[in-house]
Amino acid sequence: MKIISRLNKKNKNVYGDNTDYIGFAKIYKKLVKKNVNKILLIGAGGAARSILQFLNDEKIKQVDIFTRTLNKKKILSRTMKFDNFYIDSKEIRNKHYDLIINASDAGMLGRKNLASNIYKLVPNTSFIIDIVYNPLRTNLIETARANNVPNDGG
């Protein structure tokens, strides 16, 4: 996968592994109880790349990636070679997604919230996953709960 999120030292050697992929896979398999075809992934950093790899391994048909950072968008499109991904930083293509994933720092304590157009999508979404861990109940999770949309995160 070529993405490391944790380093371990053993017998004077350093090993890297990826907890983002494993952690997301557990949440996804616990929460998502039906096939999903259209996913909105918010973010384009290291965690988002791990999640993209998982989604590709699961053979998801369509993933729209929404990112505010043009440089990360360029890096992501250059390093992740999948044909079912659409990347934009200005608009969201669909009004309905089976799953919305926040893999950005938006909503994290001390950071900006997600763009308001994201929250408007929640009532028409089947599942929400927000990987932000502080606070555990982000505005996205609270919006999902208020609309009775199954959700998980952290």
Report the location of each language-model feature.
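Conserved S-adenosyl-L-methionine
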Residues: 57-62, 146-150
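NAD(P)-binding Rossmann-fold cofactor-contacting core
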Residues: 60-80
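Short, conserved loop/helix-junction motifs that constitute active-site signature segments
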Residues: 33-35, 57-59, 117-125
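Glycine-rich adenosine-cofactor-binding loop
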Residues: 28, 36-57, 67
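A general structural signal for well-ordered alpha-helical segments in protein cores
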Residues: 1-4, 21, 48, 73, ...
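Phosphate/diphosphate ligand-binding glycine-rich loop within oxidoreductases
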Residues: 1-31
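Rossmann-like adenosine-cofactor binding region
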Residues: 83-153
